[in-house]
């Protein structure tokens, strides 16, 4: 309802695929309205009129904004007509983009036989990447590193795990290995040929800050990998860790990526660019 003073609103998202793109766009916009909370209703894999019946019935029960990514013309027209009858706003997220392509290319879209199978293949590829990434987190199962697309290395608290998971959600099989002074790196890491190895690093000051926050969260005295609590947050020790990681990265010619002021999304985007560049170089 236009001009509502409620602290929440219903946000309906309809997709004929996984709905990931739709959710990302919707949340990015909703985040700009800090005082209003969206109640999300996500309807993935909607590909028939029968499936749409259920969706439209739920929208009628809780009217709100309707966003959709549907390719079937009949489904699009029905969503738009029904929302108009209900007097609620609706918008195709891909419609304007397709119109832009159509105007620039001067041609209509051509039906792609098996296009949905391609979408399904991409979905299962992401699932496979996630499974691999979770199995190869924090230096686990190093014997399988050669099967990775990307291997992230770095000292503690350089966002290796969350970046790995983000990349896996893009279908990139990602392993991560911690670099700890005094502990030899896995021999498998020295002989990798297929994967791109990227070294994540941050300033000692930033690492100390992040690690102090972590200790506050888990409680003092919690076990830390390969070190005591004092050295974990000691400025000099952390600076030595950073220097150690840089020296190791130079030795093996691993590209360095500074994550000091980067969000997880920005770090992942930078890694994906390095990965894409490498793919092009290797044909």
Swiss-Prot record:
- InterPro entries, per the entry: Kinase-pyrophosphorylase, PPDK_reg
Q: Which UniProt keywords apply?
A: Kinase, Nucleotide-binding, Serine/threonine-protein kinase, Transferase
Q: Which domain of life is it from?
A: Bacteria
* Catalytically driven reaction(s): N(tele)-phospho-L-histidyl/L-threonyl-[pyruvate, phosphate dikinase] + ADP = N(tele)-phospho-L-histidyl/O-phospho-L-threonyl-[pyruvate, phosphate dikinase] + AMP + H(+); N(tele)-phospho-L-histidyl/O-phospho-L-threonyl-[pyruvate, phosphate dikinase] + phosphate + H(+) = N(tele)-phospho-L-histidyl/L-threonyl-[pyruvate, phosphate dikinase] + diphosphate
Q: Which GO terms describe its molecular function?
A: ADP binding; ATP binding; phosphotransferase activity, phosphate group as acceptor; protein serine/threonine kinase activity
Q: What's one Pfam family here?
A: Kinase-PPPase
Sequence positions that bind ADP: 154-161
Nucleotide-binding: present as a keyword of the record?
yes
- EC assignment: 2.7.11.32, 2.7.4.27
Give the family this protein belongs to, as stated in its UniProt record: Belongs to the pyruvate, phosphate/water dikinase regulatory protein family. PDRP subfamily.
Per the entry, what this protein does is: Bifunctional serine/threonine kinase and phosphorylase involved in the regulation of the pyruvate, phosphate dikinase (PPDK) by catalyzing its phosphorylation/dephosphorylation.
PANTHER family the UniProt entry points to? PYRUVATE, PHOSPHATE DIKINASE REGULATORY PROTEIN 1, CHLOROPLASTIC
**Which protein, by its recorded name, is this?**
Putative pyruvate, phosphate dikinase regulatory protein
